[in-house]
């Protein structure tokens, strides 16, 4: 159900509270997922004119789970705070004295419900952390992370239900990784969606038993960051080592991700240097180039009255990854009606060369390769 459809069914006096939750409500580490409501119902009599819904189920993303809490207002007394039912978490009993925004409920503030929900989620986090005391191993993992502010202040924990047969229970740690994405080139962060939210990397680590014999890590990147780093398949984090612990493993993942970001930033500046060198060496032979991301360059060249194009595609992780050179005849066509072309990656190249050296080496390579390309174009293409 879309936020607009839901809001149209809410009692008008309660609508400002709900609107603030579904339109602006982001709670916890996962900034890519908003709060949402379902199961709208009314406690009013059938004679009450609509819209009159005053109770609903609130879905809250937390530590890779979705909490489903019932929120119950009274449309007849909209100035009163709501009641809460915490679904399956029957052991979760919030401390009322710590719920300042509930105790001092201000119906003139549209965000008062959202503020109460945030306080409840904080208490729910403390409740889940307290459950780890049943396992000395999981408590060790939690306490060692807590001692590091960069991890301890950006962590959510969910302890699963205890197995009645074994007495074991699973637990999931969700951490917001302290990785700086601010220097990623802006062109890579465009066109993902209209409201991408915060740029964030979340590491989820699931312990399937209290002795950490089965541990499953997974990295989640916000849409813009995933796109900027080359897609979901571009980054593979290491398996959790047997006998390892989170305080050693999490920095490894941070280091891996930081290096990946640096590769992208370095690649952008190196591609710009590369294209600047080609503009200098080939001058009017440059037909077009990508002036934003510096990922493509096209040259129009001539060798002994034979004109040809060279399309240069620079990869995201240039100069580590070698550019592709595609030679294209301006005269000859394939059977499918395309200009005859050959792609080359087997040519002299070193990622240690600067842009000027790469341009000089490319010019020398063009002279040696073009004769055989011309011969192949005449042999295999059609005028």
UniProtKB/Swiss-Prot annotation:
Compartments annotated for it: namely: Cytoplasm; Nucleus
Choose one Gene Ontology CC annotation of this protein and give it: nucleus
Give the record's keywords alphabetically. Answer: Acetylation, Apoptosis, Cell cycle, Cell division, Chromatin regulator, Cytoplasm, DNA damage, DNA repair, Mitosis, Nucleus, Phosphoprotein, Repeat, Ubl conjugation pathway
Write out the ranges of the annotated region (UEV-like 2).
275-364
UniProt modified residues of type N-acetylmethionine: 1
Q: Which residues form a coiled coil?
A: none
List the residue ranges of the region (UEV-like 1).
Answer: 30-147
The keyword Iron is assigned to this record: no
Where are residues bearing Phosphoserine located in the sequence? Answer: 2
Q: What is its main location?
A: cytoplasm
InterPro entries named in the record: BRE
Subunit field text: Component of the ARISC complex, at least composed of UIMC1/RAP80, ABRAXAS1, BRCC3/BRCC36, BABAM2 and BABAM1/NBA1. Component of the BRCA1-A complex, at least composed of BRCA1, BARD1, UIMC1/RAP80, ABRAXAS1, BRCC3/BRCC36, BABAM2 and BABAM1/NBA1. In the BRCA1-A complex, interacts directly with ABRAXAS1, BRCC3/BRCC36 and BABAM1/NBA1. Binds polyubiquitin. Component of the BRISC complex, at least composed of ABRAXAS2, BRCC3/BRCC36, BABAM2 and BABAM1/NBA1. Identified in a complex with SHMT2 and the other subunits of the BRISC complex.
PANTHER family, per this entry?
BRISC AND BRCA1-A COMPLEX MEMBER 2 (PTHR15189:SF7)
- Domain description: Contains 2 ubiquitin-conjugating enzyme family-like (UEV-like) regions. These regions lack the critical Cys residues required for ubiquitination but retain the ability to bind ubiquitin.
Tell me, what does this protein do in biology? Component of the BRCA1-A complex, a complex that specifically recognizes 'Lys-63'-linked ubiquitinated histones H2A and H2AX at DNA lesions sites, leading to target the BRCA1-BARD1 heterodimer to sites of DNA damage at double-strand breaks (DSBs). The BRCA1-A complex also possesses deubiquitinase activity that specifically removes 'Lys-63'-linked ubiquitin on histones H2A and H2AX.
Q: What is this protein called?
A: BRISC and BRCA1-A complex member 2
Species in which this protein is naturally found:
Chlorocebus aethiops (Green monkey)
Recite the lineage of the species. Answer: Eukaryota, Metazoa, Chordata, Craniata, Vertebrata
């Amino acid at each position: 159900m879309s936020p607009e459809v839901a809001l149209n069914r809410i009692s008008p006096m309660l609508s400002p509270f709900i609107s603030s939750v579904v339109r602006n409500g982001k709670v916890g580490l996962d900034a890519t997922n908003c709060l949402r409501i379902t199961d709208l119902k009314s406690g009013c009599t059938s004679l009450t004119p609509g819209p009159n819904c005053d109770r609903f189920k609130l879905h809250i993303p937390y530590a890779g789970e979705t909490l489903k809490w019932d929120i119950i207002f009274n449309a007849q007394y909209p100035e009163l705070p709501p009641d809460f039912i915490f679904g399956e978490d029957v052991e979760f009993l919030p401390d009322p004295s710590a719920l300042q925004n509930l105790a001092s409920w201000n119906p003139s503030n549209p965000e008062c419900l959202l503020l109460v929900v945030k306080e409840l989620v904080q208490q729910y986090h403390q409740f889940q952390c307290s459950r780890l005391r049943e396992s000395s191993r999981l408590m060790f993992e939690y306490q060692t992370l807590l001692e590091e502010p960069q991890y301890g202040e950006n962590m959510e924990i969910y302890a699963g239900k205890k197995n009645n047969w074994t007495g074991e229970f699973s637990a999931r740690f969700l951490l917001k990784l302290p990785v700086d994405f601010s220097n990623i080139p802006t062109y890579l962060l465009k066109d993902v969606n209209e409201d991408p939210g915060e740029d964030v990397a979340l590491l989820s680590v699931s312990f399937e038993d209290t002795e950490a014999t089965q541990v499953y890590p997974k990295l989640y990147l916000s849409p813009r960051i995933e796109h900027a780093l080359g897609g979901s398949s571009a980054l593979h984090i290491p398996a959790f080592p047997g006998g390892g612990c989170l305080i050693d493993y999490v920095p490894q993942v941070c280091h891996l991700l930081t290096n990946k970001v640096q590769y992208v930033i370095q690649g952008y500046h190196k591609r710009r240097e590369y294209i600047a060198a080609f503009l200098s060496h080939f001058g009017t032979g440059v037909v077009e180039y990508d002036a934003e991301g510096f990922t493509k360059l096209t040259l129009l060249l001539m060798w002994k009255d034979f004109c040809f194009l060279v399309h240069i595609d620079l990869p995201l992780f240039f100069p580590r990854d070698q550019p592709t050179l595609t030679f294209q005849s301006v005269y000859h066509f394939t059977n499918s009606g395309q200009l005859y072309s050959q792609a080359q990656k087997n040519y002299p190249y070193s990622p240690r060369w600067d842009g000027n050296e790469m341009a000089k080496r490319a010019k020398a390579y063009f002279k040696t390769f073009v004769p055989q390309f011309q011969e192949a174009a005449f042999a295999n293409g059609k005028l």
